[in-house]
Amino acid sequence: MWFLILFLALSLGGIDAAPPGQSRIVGGYKCEKNSQPWQVAIINEYLCGGVLIDPSWVITAAHCYSNYYHVLLGRNNLFEDEPFAQYRFVNQSFPHPDYKPFLMRNHTRQRGDDYSNDLMLLHLSEPADITDGVKVIDLPTEEPKVGSTCLASGWGSTKPLNWELPDDLQCVNIHLLSNEKCIEAYEQKVTDLMLCAGEMDGRKDTCKGDSGGPLICDGVLQGITSWGNVPCAEPYNPGVYTKLIKFTSWIKEVMKENP
């Protein structure tokens, strides 16, 4: 039944590619099958990505907040019957308390906006079964290094200006840049709670529908796709990601207090 709902929603426009005012793979490639087993798809009135960090917990972007969530795990293709596919509801969501609530609603980006703390935990209705196609990924323990090679993934739009969603999970290789590159690019605030990643000549970027997905640098989960330029993949406009190393204590506290 969930497959039919997903197909109809995406095909007939019942789900938007991303929450209003936010981004979030352009210039990427089809991920190798089961190479990103921690990647999840979150279906509500929007399409977002997420990351399995514990059998019972998914981390995503706070701007993906909704009144309901359907979580798809173990997926490579959203529209094919796959052996590792699992489906879960969400018992409770925990947006970061310092993320501004009005940014969760219909909001057009304004000069000076601060999207810090764009992080949310989802408690699954029942634990995911850990298999070859569904695995957890550890939280970071060290600061990421500027210049690191990073990989972002998602089912978001592959065209900067149009809503063109792929069937298959897409990956893109980008580099971690200094935050100064994003400060120069945007009128919105870029803080030390964020990471700046992309290519300065454009061509490669996360885009609409990739929000909440992973940014993995040198093999370590370091970021969650948050926001960026519209259209995506423009020169001198890298993507902006939530910096997870700044939030590990909060994440662990929420998980401990809500077993």
UniProtKB/Swiss-Prot annotation:
InterPro entries: Peptidase_S1_PA, Peptidase_S1_PA_chymotrypsin, Peptidase_S1A, Trypsin_dom, TRYPSIN_HIS, TRYPSIN_SER. It is an enzyme of class 3 (hydrolase). Its EC number is 3.4.21.35. It comes from the Eukaryota. Residues 1-18 form the signal peptide. GO terms for biological process: regulation of systemic arterial blood pressure; zymogen activation. Probably N- and O-glycosylated. One of its GO terms (molecular function) is serine-type endopeptidase activity. It catalyses: Preferential cleavage of Arg-|-Xaa bonds in small molecule substrates. Highly selective action to release kallidin (lysyl-bradykinin) from kininogen involves hydrolysis of Met-|-Xaa or Leu-|-Xaa. The active site is at 63 (charge relay system), 118 (charge relay system), 211 (charge relay system). Glycans are attached at residues 91, 106. Residues 25-256 form the Peptidase S1 domain. PANTHER family: KALLIKREIN-1 (PTHR24271:SF47), KALLIKREIN-RELATED (PTHR24271). This is Glandular kallikrein-10.
